[in-house]
Amino acid sequence: MTKRITTIKEMQHLSRTRKAHNKQIGFVPTMGALHDGHLQMVKQSIADNDYTVVSVFVNPLQFGPNEDFDAYPRTIEEDEAQLDALGADYVFYPSVEEMYPKPLELSINVHRMAEVLEGAKRPGHFDGVVTVVNKLFNIIRPDIAYFGKKDAQQLAIIEKMVEEFNHPITIRGMDTIRELDGLAKSSRNIYLTDNERQEAVQLYQSLLKAKQLYDAGERSSDVIIDEIHTHLTTHTSGTIEEIAIYSYPELIEQTQITGRIFISLAVKFSQARLIDNIIVEKS
């Protein structure tokens, strides 16, 4: 039975107790509304560790002024039932008041890595992400933490935080979980209309076309980006907000590709903004 924990004090006590008995803790941070991508990470954590903790916390610090924090789906009962079925040990479900009893005097600022891609459109977003993840790491003290490669920029920033702040934690990036037709699983997919849902598969198809170009020897970012743009404008009604190619995990924009990259895109449909990416190894 998955145990719900709502206070920092109890979570810290449990973590200390498990550590004192040389038990390994796996941690999957989420904002809830769990889908198969989250559950795959939970399954991996259960396989890898003695205990698995899943946090469900909608973090206000990572929402901008034009982003509706109150509208984010909150489905703790359904989430808890899914975690219980898998055999997760604990769900850490603190309130905002528990995590932030007073306005923070200190926070973590992400510099260059947050000034591109999603970070450029959402100022302060990654500061909020890194601040809460840092707090969660200190509360739960995991040995391994699991993050999805679907949010590749976030993964790269978390890896950098662990490196620079000397957290004794292994970060495990998990492959993007997709629907049978290739659409990346996301809590936002429920906001797509039927027609948009059919079109949304073209995001991944455009990335696969880009990879084919790369594998065939193309190294010009402009050529690859043009191919993605043409495919998306032809096959979807969404607004293309970004197509970019960056080195990974350094997050340096590429004009002439020389090494490991990730190709990222963002498309806005009527009620949902979808992102997707693929990481391409140097051939």
From Swiss-Prot:
Protein name (record): Pantothenate synthetase
Coiled coil: none
Active site: 38 (proton donor)
CC annotations in GO: cytosol
Organism: Oceanobacillus iheyensis (strain DSM 14371 / CIP 107618 / JCM 11309 / KCTC 3954 / HTE831)
Principal location class: cytoplasm
Name of the gene: panC
Record keyword Ligase present: yes
Miscellaneous field: The reaction proceeds by a bi uni uni bi ping pong mechanism.
